Amino acid sequence: MAFTEIKHPLIIDKLTRMRKTETSSKDFRENLNEIAQLMVYEIFRDLKLEPVEITTPVAKTTGYTINQPVVLVPILRAGIGMLDGIQKLIPTARIAHVGLYRDETTLEIHQYFAKTTKDIDKSYVIVVDPMLATGGSACKAIDIVKQWGAKEVKFVCLVAVEPGIKRLQEQHPDVEIYAASKDEKLNEKGYIIPGLGDAGDRIFGTK
């Protein structure tokens, strides 16, 4: 399925601010949410609409309203940082959760939490995580939401690299990938270069 890099001057500017080592957790979180909000327009381009009859101050007409439920699935913990920005434009979205952690020695992904929501099989499901590095977490999370019954799934991140993109496309060819930036490479520890550092630590100020 397609990989889309959403390029826009506002996104590029805010992402540059996030990359800087000296950026505070507060500013990092704010820019993360603002970028997520800016990406919404492209991510939800094909949401289903239904006609509704309405009355304006001067006439009756036909309008259109979204008739497809949306479920956001943050990969804990860093994915939580993207929710507010998306929910500002999609306030009716329900939230499911997938908790994963990576063994820093083996780079293997382990699940520690998962909580679904109703009607996920009928919903437009967006899995969110700031980083798409090796692709292990993204693939594991999408495995889980598909086990829940999700049929229409997209993956949204800020920064992605080719190994993660390729792995996700190979394991889940039906899932569209959206990123604010395609970065250069992974280092020997599996971190994105130039990247953002550890997004979870920077969001929550834990380092």
Curated annotation (Swiss-Prot):
Binding positions (uracil): I192, G197, D198, A199
Binding note for cofactor: Binds 1 Mg(2+) ion per subunit. The magnesium is bound as Mg-PRPP.
Catalyzed reaction equations: UMP + diphosphate = 5-phospho-alpha-D-ribose 1-diphosphate + uracil
Keyword rRNA-binding (UniProt): no
Sorted UniProt keywords: Allosteric enzyme, Glycosyltransferase, GTP-binding, Magnesium, Nucleotide-binding, Transferase
Coiled-coil ranges per UniProt: none
Keyword Protein biosynthesis attributed: no
GO biological process: UMP salvage; uracil salvage
Activity modulation: Allosterically activated by GTP.
SUPFAM superfamilies on file: PRTase-like
Cofactor(s) this protein cannot do without: Mg(2+)
GO MF annotations, alphabetized: GTP binding; magnesium ion binding; uracil phosphoribosyltransferase activity
Binding-site residues for 5-phospho-alpha-D-ribose 1-diphosphate, renumbered to this chain: R77, R102, D129, P130, M131, L132, A133, T134, G135, G136, S137, D198
NCBIfam families hit by this protein: PRK00129.1 (NF001097), upp (TIGR01091)
Function summary: Catalyzes the conversion of uracil and 5-phospho-alpha-D-ribose 1-diphosphate (PRPP) to UMP and diphosphate.
Family: Belongs to the UPRTase family.
Name used for this protein in its record: Uracil phosphoribosyltransferase
Originating species: Mycoplasma mycoides subsp. mycoides SC (strain CCUG 32753 / NCTC 10114 / PG1)
